[in-house]
Regions:
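Single-residue recognition of alpha-helix boundary sites
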Residues: 178-181, 213-215
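Active-site SXXK
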Residues: 168-180, 193
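Glycosyltransferase-associated regions of secretory-pathway enzymes
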Residues: 1-168, 194-304
Length: 304
């Protein structure tokens, strides 16, 4: 019944508090640019005393037995490392290792040439005194540098194995949300619905007890970092109640229009701002309070 729906408001507008039940899958991510730094038959995820990331994930899986725990991975892994991942899945049957390579993200792609050409024509349509000639030259050079077979936004993030690689594909995975588990074709995922939500956690977020059901505003919430009283949205936690959440689609739209878009600040933060019509004259700290994923049973950011 509608009466049961709770609302929260930001800037005078009401938003439903959407419910993530206690079976909503959790997703961790490990994109490894140098698998050779691990043993050839070891799980290629850092697990030191200082940064026990693998243990944190295993701990989450043992506490949250009713949930599926995805580990979204990418890297040139050795066969023995892949076997070690399979053994991990065997030892903890709710852990599902999802290889980036096994998932089709093409529905979120756009040709790089289109992004550059749109930006070039935007510049060229301006009166000459308003044009940024330096930028125009740069865009034309970038356009001519696109290699055949690589005219693709999603492929461009595979070439650079930096932060953008992990951040961009994290956004792609969260657009798929629960569907990611179905597409990975893993045993035991079939009772997920195709539009199921998902909660992404960085591997330095430690779960201490079951999270239970969680309410999030309009179906999305993210981690908020507070330093000296200043808040900022972070992508260390992203929770959505469905696939193709409109806030993440708004972020993707920015990635599709800006030639120098950033997957974290544009793909997540600016997409969320746009979705909730946040404008710069509003109090950013109170917006962060509104969108924050808060939970007493998660110790946040332990690797600081």
């Amino acid at each position: 019944t509608n009466r049961d729906i709770q609302f929260t408001s930001f800037n005078g507008k009401d938003y439903p508090l959407c419910f993530l039940d206690e079976k909503t899958p959790l997703l961790f991510q490990w994109f490894e640019r140098n698998p050779a730094r691990f043993g050839k038959n070891d799980i290629p995820i850092i697990n030191t005393e200082k940064n026990p990331y693998l243990n944190n994930i295993i701990k989450a899986a043992t506490i949250e037995k009713e949930r599926l725990i995805g580990i979204f991975v990418d890297g040139d892994f050795f066969p023995g490392q892949k076997d070690a991942f399979s053994k991990l899945e065997y030892d903890y049957e709710n852990i599902k290792v999802i290889y980036r390579n096994d998932i089709d993200f093409s529905m979120y792609d756009k040709k790089l040439s289109e992004i550059y050409m749109e930006n070039i024509s935007k510049q060229e349509s301006m009166p000459e005194e308003k044009r940024d000639c330096h930028l125009l030259q740069l865009l034309k050079k970038e356009l001519s540098d696109i290699q055949e077979g690589n005219d693709s936004l999603i492929k461009s993030y595979l070439l650079d194995k930096g932060h953008g690689w992990a951040d961009f594909y994290r956004n792609m995975a969260m657009l798929k949300a629960g569907q990611l588990f179905l597409e990975a074709d893993k045993v035991g995922c079939y009772d997920l619905s195709t539009n199921s939500g998902c909660i992404y956690l960085d591997a330095d977020m430690i779960i201490t007890e079951k999270l239970g059901g969680i309410y999030i505003p309009d179906g999305i919430a993210v981690h908020v970092e507070r330093i000296d009283g200043r808040a900022s949205m972070e992508n260390g936690i992203i929770a959505v109640d469905r696939n193709n959440h409109p806030a993440l689609l708004a972020g993707l739209e920015i990635m599709h229009t800006k030639f120098d878009a950033d997957p974290y600040s544009d793909g997540v933060c600016n997409g969320i701002r746009k979705h909730f019509n946040y404008s710069l004259n509003e109090d950013y700290n109170s917006f962060c309070d509104f969108i924050e994923f808060k939970h007493d049973n998660i110790i946040m950011n332990t690797s600081q």
